[in-house]
Curated annotation (Swiss-Prot):
<dbReference type="InterPro" id="IPR051041">
    <property type="entry name" value="FMRFamide-related_np"/>
</dbReference>
<comment type="function">
    <text>FMRFamide induces contractions in visceral and somatic musculature as well as in the heart. May play a role as cotransmitters or modulators in a number of significant neuronal systems.</text>
</comment>
<feature type="propeptide">
    <location>
        <begin position="179"/>
        <end position="184"/>
    </location>
</feature>
<dbReference type="GO" id="GO:0007218">
    <property type="term" value="P:neuropeptide signaling pathway"/>
</dbReference>
<dbReference type="InterPro" id="IPR002544">
    <property type="entry name" value="FMRFamid-related_peptide-like"/>
</dbReference>
<feature type="propeptide">
    <location>
        <begin position="36"/>
        <end position="37"/>
    </location>
</feature>
<feature type="propeptide">
    <location>
        <begin position="108"/>
        <end position="149"/>
    </location>
</feature>
<feature type="propeptide">
    <location>
        <begin position="200"/>
        <end position="204"/>
    </location>
</feature>
<feature type="modified residue" description="Phenylalanine amide">
    <location>
        <position position="155"/>
    </location>
</feature>
<feature type="propeptide">
    <location>
        <begin position="213"/>
        <end position="217"/>
    </location>
</feature>
<feature type="region of interest" description="Disordered">
    <location>
        <begin position="104"/>
        <end position="133"/>
    </location>
</feature>
<feature type="modified residue" description="Phenylalanine amide">
    <location>
        <position position="210"/>
    </location>
</feature>
<protein>
    <recommendedName>
        <fullName>FMRFamide neuropeptides</fullName>
    </recommendedName>
</protein>
<feature type="propeptide">
    <location>
        <begin position="260"/>
        <end position="263"/>
    </location>
</feature>
<keyword id="KW-0732">Signal</keyword>
<feature type="modified residue" description="Phenylalanine amide">
    <location>
        <position position="176"/>
    </location>
</feature>
<keyword id="KW-0027">Amidation</keyword>
Length: 306
């Protein structure tokens, strides 16, 4: 095989270089697409010249009116006119920037005369000033509406101020604070009767209360012994009438089982009435205050036999 000469090698290299240059000038005429750092296909406006995403021309996938310039800053799938100037905008600018712009004379309101004031042809007349003394319709606001007692979230416009209670701030219901003089301020309040936890002899602490206070009326959800300050006829939540009528143990009220007036406390099982009933004392709550002599003797006999 005959070797190539230096001229042939130089010609091959020149042809290859020329081919690369022509291909680069034909295929990659857009510098945005020819950038090596822009690799991925991206839609929208580029944030920077070094944006690493390849972008198509803005003419693709566009719906709307085309512009005068071949390359416009229009995004994809936009409706309406572009932000770039159109043909009409160019013509308007050329006319307005001419050496002898067209002017027109404004007609005078006086008869037989014409104003000499020159105005631009595209200028608009000055808007008429609005009437300063125009009456403005306002909503009716009486003197009674300015009362401090008529506050937020009130319903109705009745004359009775005391009946407007619900969903009001500063009135009876849904109020927070302490006011011993107002009896109607009860529900959902802190420091009053319902849903109260604490000890205060001077107030009526009734529902959902835990503790011991001789001077207060502690009724519901109460477990324990009675005090001297409580009423004996208070028979709330008794299971039978015999417990309510018995005077031996007044405060044994809730969750009691049995019909005997004797000392049967909580969660006891059995119905026998003989002397061995004291042995059936499982799941009982509380302590006995007094025991009969017969029960004491039975306990002593059982202790000696054991």
């Amino acid at each position: 095989m005959k070797t190539w000469s230096h001229v042939a090698l130089l010609a091959c290299l020149s042809i290859k270089w020329l081919t690369c240059v022509m291909a680069d000038s034909i295929y990659c005429d857009d510098p945005d697409m020819c950038s090596m750092t822009k690799r991925f296909l991206r839609f929208g406006r580029a944030l920077d010249t070094t944006d690493p995403f390849i972008r198509l021309r803005r003419q693709f996938y566009r719906i709307g009116r085309g512009g005068y310039q071949p390359y416009q800053d229009k995004r994809f799938l936009r409706f309406g006119r572009s932000e770039q100037p159109d043909v009409d905008d160019y013509l308007r600018d050329v006319v307005l920037q001419s050496e002898e712009p067209l002017y027109r004379k404004r007609r005078s309101t006086e008869a037989g005369g014409q104003s000499e004031e020159m105005t631009h042809r595209t200028a608009r007349s000055a808007p008429e000033p609005a009437a300063e003394n125009r009456e403005i319709m306002k909503r009716e606001t009486g003197a009674e509406d300015l009362d401090e007692e008529k506050r937020f979230m009130r319903f109705g416009r009745g004359d009775e101020e005391a009946e407007k209670r619900f969903m009001r701030f500063g009135k009876s219901f849904m109020r927070f604070g302490r006011d011993m003089s107002d009896v109607d301020k009860r529900f959902m309040r802190f420091g009053k009767r319902f849903m109260r936890f604490g000890r205060e002899p001077g107030t009526d602490k009734r529902f959902m209360r835990f503790g011991r206070e001789p001077g207060a009326d502690k009724r519901f959800m109460r477990f324990g012994k009675s005090f001297d300050g409580e009423e004996e006829n208070d028979d709330d939540l008794y299971y039978n009438e015999s417990d309510a009528d018995s005077n031996d143990d007044v405060d044994k009220r809730f969750m009691r089982f049995g019909k005997s007036a004797e000392e049967k406390r909580f969660m006891r099982f059995g119905k026998s009435e003989d002397a061995s009933r004291d042995k059936k004392e499982f799941l009982r709550i509380g302590k006995r205050e007094s025991r009969s002599a017969e029960v004491e003797n039975n306990i002593q006999i059982a202790a000696k036999q054991s």
